[in-house]
A protein has these predicted regions:
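Extreme N-terminal basic, low-complexity initiation segments
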Residues: 2-5
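N-terminal loops that bind phosphate or other acidic moieties
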Residues: 8-344
Length: 344
């Protein structure tokens, strides 16, 4: 992020610093960022020259959004990155997930080795896959017993998320991997938006009802334990979330300050954006919802952020499939503005 380095902005190891480490994060979220309204206007004018208003539908809207946030015309995607943030959760021991922390490790190893289906989809889109492992061998504590992170750990993890933009991509797609992350995200959603745990842990049709009950009980216990901290979105993230959610928050913040559009994936990344949105709605205007999963809570979260999904492909969950697929669609949105005319 222009103007500071991680070690300068987050003086996490300086005992002389009295304010909360998360105060710096809040300041970055609230700090205004300039966009390029002229580039967006040129997209609109070019579209009108290609046909009637609205002919290009969501593609036209996406092109305008890209130009505004890339701060250039024509918009183009030449260096996209797909960032996968992987974490582990102590709540898995309570039986709230169909997968385990060892499954997360296996998935990450497959991604790093280029063997996962997601690797092929990202390659087809021309995206670089970057995997960020967040202490996979040290699960966060069960949020029903203690906070997921200390203030310093949460702030440091948010700062670590800044590294997703260190290669200066012109589009950043984000996703998470972690058994239990959906339940943690549901707990954060309860704190941000209210409603019952049952509402936010609502599963897809393939999830056993018994699992939903365990998730709801755990979220209820966590909300009761941390009830004195949940009026602050960053505190809700710290107490109820996980490292991958915090790193996504950091990636979203850093991308905005560097003029990099962000493509969200599933429910968990949407809730990470929700944390930022709860502090400043304008601070997520550079984010686009790639798709909508079959998890009902995902649709509810998108509604809270006033985000319409670009795609509806009936994916069961996130995991990067939606955000990776959307990269190709967004490249298509740019094509009319950068195509060279064919000479007859």
């Amino acid at each position: 992020v222009p103007g500071f380095r991680h070690e300068e902005k987050f003086t996490l190891n300086d005992p002389a610093v009295q304010k909360s480490p998360l105060a710096d994060v809040r300041e970055l979220i609230l700090k205004p960022v300039e966009t390029d309204a002229d580039a967006a206007r040129r997209v609109r004018e070019a579209l009108l020259g290609m046909g009637r208003e609205g002919d290009f539908g969501r593609l036209g809207e996406a092109a305008e959004w890209l130009a505004r946030w890339q701060r250039r015309f024509p918009p183009r995607i030449e260096k996209p990155t797909l960032a996968i943030f992987a974490g582990s959760h102590g709540i898995v021991d309570a039986g709230v997930s169909l997968s385990s922390n060892s499954d997360t490790r296996a998935h990450i190893e497959a991604l790093k080795g280029g063997r996962a289906p997601l690797s092929a989809i990202a390659a087809q889109a021309g995206a670089t896959v970057r995997v960020f492992e967040l202490a996979l061998d040290r699960p966060t504590p069960s949020i029903a017993k203690e906070a997921a992170m200390t203030e310093r750990e949460c702030a440091a993890t948010i700062a670590y998320g800044f590294e997703a933009v260190e290669d200066q991509p012109d589009l950043l797609a984000i996703a998470v991997s972690g058994a239990g992350v959906g339940t943690a995200a549901a707990a954060v959603a309860c704190a941000l938006y209210g409603g019952s745990p049952d509402y936010w842990v609502r599963p897809s049709a393939q999830t056993p009802a018994s699992l939903s009950g365990k998730r709801s009980e755990l979220v209820s216990a966590a909300l009761k334990l941390h009830r004195g901290h949940l009026s602050d979105p960053l505190e809700a993230l710290r107490c109820l979330g996980g490292r991958e959610l915090a790193a996504c928050v950091g990636a979203i913040i850093a991308a905005r300050h560097q003029g990099i559009p962000v493509v969200l994936d599933g429910f968990a990344t949407t809730i990470s954006a929700g944390v930022v949105h709860a502090i400043s709605p304008q601070a997520v205007s550079h984010c686009l919802a790639s798709h909508i999963t079959q998890r009902p809570a995902h649709e509810a979260a998108l509604e809270r952020l006033s985000l319409a999904p670009l795609l509806q492909l009936q994916f069961q969950t996130g995991g990067g499939l939606g955000s990776a697929t959307a990269i190709g669609v967004l490249k298509t949105a740019c094509a009319p503005f950068i195509a060279k005319p064919v000479e007859g």
